[in-house]
Amino acid sequence: MTLTVRVIAPDKTIWDKEAQEVILPSTTGQLGILGGHAPLLTALDTGVMRVRAENDWIAIALMGGFAEIEADEVSILVNGAERGDNIDTEKARLAYEEAEKRLQTSESSDNLQEKIKAKQTLKRARARLQAAGGMVN
């Protein structure tokens, strides 16, 4: 049984195709979706979404949002998203390393906003690098 999967960001549609399976980074953990799933509305965390379409897995970096799931349809509204095959792995790796350094620097600061922003930047950089295929813990 297939699903119609749509990933929509404010500036463009990232994905609008049929798929056999979807794995989403919800705020409570990974969520696997197959055809015939019970209706669900869930918040999404920054992370990597995986879509199995035509027996290939496609990775998409999501920057938080919401997913509405029906029996055969998954609609995903996100703050930002990028397909892994459109991400330059080396640039993503450099951005991740820079974000790690920024977080380490912010840890010695008393500025709470700076710490939060550094953690968010690292989380986004990690999602992009993972979606591009550059493994990160």
UniProtKB/Swiss-Prot annotation:
Record's signal peptide: none
- Report how it sits in the membrane: Peripheral membrane protein
Q: Which family does it belong to?
A: Belongs to the ATPase epsilon chain family.
Checking PANTHER family in the record gives: ATP SYNTHASE DELTA/EPSILON CHAIN, ATP SYNTHASE EPSILON CHAIN, CHLOROPLASTIC
Q: Which NCBIfam families match?
A: ATP_synt_epsi
* Compartment(s) of residence: Cellular thylakoid membrane
Pfam families membership: ATP-synt_DE, ATP-synt_DE_N
Major site of localization recorded for this protein: membrane
Q: What does this protein do?
A: Produces ATP from ADP in the presence of a proton gradient across the membrane.
Could you tell me which InterPro entries the record lists for this protein?
ATP_synth_F1_dsu/esu, ATP_synth_F1_dsu/esu_N, ATP_synth_F1_esu_C, ATPsynth_dsu/esu_N
Which GO terms label this protein's molecular function in UniProt? ATP binding; proton-transporting ATP synthase activity, rotational mechanism
GO CC, alphabetical: plasma membrane-derived thylakoid membrane; proton-transporting ATP synthase complex
In its UniProt entry, the species of origin is given as Trichodesmium erythraeum (strain IMS101)
Specify the protein name: ATP synthase epsilon chain
From which domain of life does this come? Bacteria
Q: Which UniProt keywords apply?
A: ATP synthesis, CF(1), Hydrogen ion transport, Ion transport, Membrane, Thylakoid, Transport
* Quaternary assembly: F-type ATPases have 2 components, CF(1) - the catalytic core - and CF(0) - the membrane proton channel. CF(1) has five subunits: alpha(3), beta(3), gamma(1), delta(1), epsilon(1). CF(0) has three main subunits: a, b and c.
